[in-house]
Amino acid sequence: MAPKLQWPIVTELTTASASRGAATGSRGVAPAVPRGGAPADVAHPQTIKSFVRRAGRTTAAQARAFEDLGPRFVVPYAPIAPIAPIAPAAPAAGAWFGRDAPLVLEIGFGMGEATAHIARVRPQDDFLCCEVHRPGVGALLKRIAEHGLTNIRILEHDAVEVIDHMLPESCLAGVHIFFPDPWHKSRHHKRRLIQPPLVARLAARLQAGGYLHCATDWQPYAEQMLQVLGAEPLLRNTAPGFAPKPGYRPLTKFENRGLRLGHGVRDLVFERRH
């Protein structure tokens, strides 16, 4: 049995796994009140970074993709409420995509391989994808052009600020968080992305019946995810424990490399209660 864990508050969110060479870099926001499993006697620091900035080179092709496709597919960060989290309201997704369709948020897409695949196999859904690693954004823009995708929009901004100030409650049909940085060392576990404050924020923004899908190849992190998600009162597990891999999520180059190294991959799919 995994040891009982204590959860510090996280106010800055990673947007991709460090092992994928991702980067983030924006200021934190005021911490949320933890719920669903955070012990009352835990000290909650004002700001705990869940990432470090890593350099990355944008290729000429990625730069061209920014120039040609950025105006259409990269959404500017425009907070509705710059101080307090926004109240329930209609999201701006209809204006972003030009249609009314189920909206899925992705936090951290690396180089966009899985994102583009999922958008292809689920053309009925729209995908709002947060990533601040510019080479990754450029790579996804290239994939959008290559596959003629129209149901992806990118926000090159810190995900927590997007969640707090651009997404109203009950606006999301789903959330994808695939292979976030596991922060292997014990002293860095406080920096892990999947912790009660973030999960509570996301659960509040899911529609009834909406889902939160996480995946990781680090077993201790998978167990932590299972405990944190299971403690959120607005969510229920769709499986007895870890879930079978949903058919829409592909095996990426990153994941196949992990499997060759003997890293088992765990999926977790939780649903917003009605």
Swiss-Prot record:
Residues 16-40 are annotated as: Disordered. It catalyses: guanosine(46) in tRNA + S-adenosyl-L-methionine = N(7)-methylguanosine(46) in tRNA + S-adenosyl-L-homocysteine. Disulfide bonds: none annotated. The active site is at 181. It comes from the Bacteria. Keywords: Methyltransferase, S-adenosyl-L-methionine, Transferase, tRNA processing. SUPFAM superfamilies: S-adenosyl-L-methionine-dependent methyltransferases (SSF53335). The keyword Hydrolase does not apply. InterPro entries: SAM-dependent_MTases_sf, tRNA_(Gua-N-7)_MeTrfase_Trmb, tRNA_methyltr_TrmB_bact. S-adenosyl-L-methionine binds at residues 106, 131, 158, 181. Pathway: tRNA modification; N(7)-methylguanine-tRNA biosynthesis. Coiled coil: none annotated. Its EC number is 2.1.1.33. Signal peptide: none annotated. GO terms for molecular function: tRNA (guanine(46)-N7)-methyltransferase activity. One of its GO terms (cellular component) is tRNA methyltransferase complex. Substrate binds at residues 185, 217, 252-255. NCBIfam families: tRNA (guanosine(46)-N7)-methyltransferase TrmB (TIGR00091). Belongs to the class I-like SAM-binding methyltransferase superfamily. TrmB family. Catalyzes the formation of N(7)-methylguanine at position 46 (m7G46) in tRNA. This is tRNA (guanine-N(7)-)-methyltransferase. It comes from Verminephrobacter eiseniae (strain EF01-2). The lineage of its organism: Bacteria, Pseudomonadati, Pseudomonadota, Betaproteobacteria, Burkholderiales.
